[in-house]
Amino acid sequence: MRFVVSFREGESPTTNRYPYAVLVQDNWDDYGYRSTFQVTLHLSSTEVFELGNIKIIQANSTGGYTEMPRRPFEQLPVGYASLGADLEYYETIYKLGREVFRPYFEGLRDVAFDDEAKASVEDTEGYRVSMLRFGGAERTIADAARLLRAPTLPTRRRSAGFRVKFKTRVARDSNHFTVEFDFRRRGRLPNRINALIGYNGTGKTRLLSNLAIVASGYGYSTKEDLLRNAAGRFVGTAPPFKTVVVVSYSAFDTFVIPGQNQVEKDRLQDEGELFGYVYCGLRERSDDAPDGEQTYRLRTPAEIQGEFLSALSRVREADRQQELLEVLKPLLRDPSFQRIGLTQLYANHNDDDIAELFHDLSSGHKVVLKIVTELTAHISGSEPTLVLIDEPETHLHPPLLAAFLKSVRACLEAFDGYAIIATHSPVILQETPSKYVRVLRRAADQNRIVAPSIETFAETIGVITQEVFNLGDGSTDWHETLKTLARRNSLEEIEEMFGVRLGFAARSYVLSIRDEIEE
């Protein structure tokens, strides 16, 4: 097996001796380290395999482009090491046979294949900052090592679920705390969605934002933040997420927005993601910021429509149209969608017609369709995906929210995904078993996680609102309103003002106030 490097500058070596692999130098920047290459494997003139991205680092490097041989080579020098982007990379090469993958991984000194290569770099800054930067890298090393020792390709099984323990803090002056999200399957209970609730200001969005950074490896402000785990860290075994999809339609979210330089923008344009990190939302980086500053703006309706069409195009390219229609079935049963002709919308291949239909939808319908389409477009399918959704109820009527939740769950089931939803909605809790609900509390500068006091699944909205969201009588104003009215008016006069008979609780309260007055 021979290797040649296609350099970004200067002359590049060539070879016509099969088999060989071409390593195309990328200009992606991992906080000063440029170690990314795209690999194409040529076994013959007709057998060509696009293998995707790999990282190659040197033990003695302090940054810049990885120094690579300027001539064809069969093995990298001692002190070099490589790692593929995901398990799919290793499975593709494994399927080509031992006579291919052994010289290939030996030649690139792959850390999943060669323990000595791993030992030579694992204490270096480049290993942590570049090689392990993106989500799932450590898990990929472990899984690939098992694969490459297996006598035959193991059968890929869908995950039975797992726990994710995450230690973080949500404000500079707050404590570090650990939250455990539980996705383990228990019988036929719906296990793929965890709900996160808490009062405004407790830090729910910040918690999800930190989790997105750590799970994906994208979004640290500086190299130092990455090295000191500024956003948090996983406790125990790292989760097996290949892709992280962030969904937020709040103008005030704190999620990291990709596209901070031209390299990132170009990659987003080509692939729709940055090494597995996907942001679906309202905010966009502004190009009008003064030098050295970063500001944001809200995306225009035309940009949102363009993103929807782009996601729909990716669904077609991935041949997932049928899966998308299955995912949309719960929405098709919602009365508000039955009037739209949703099936016709997605069956139409004329983007101008689709754009016109999308343009005429309500804001809630646009949000729902865009989210579900983007999830179907970007969710991995080959390895688990983490989906983080921040307060989806903002734009949605409760019945539409319930239908949306069913569609999200169907998408997660279809493609082996898992979601965490930060919410204030009792509708979402009504659809979620309490063992999959986490309550974030804050007192002064101390955060902690507690469990709901009741079983939330299938409970009435009123009980959930009172017992879980703590909306007691003291939190509402209707008592004061009725007390003021009852001091001057009879029950009959009050009901005449409303135009309908009051409910049991209101009538009882008015009568009790009238009794006090008459005494």
Regions found by a protein language model. Give the residues of each.
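Intrinsically disordered, low-complexity regions
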Residues: 73, 80, 145, 161-163, ...
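Switch/communication elements of ASCE P-loop NTPase nucleotide-binding domains
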Residues: 173-225, 232-235, 347-481
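Short acidic, glycine-rich loop/turn motifs
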Residues: 41-43, 166-172, 444
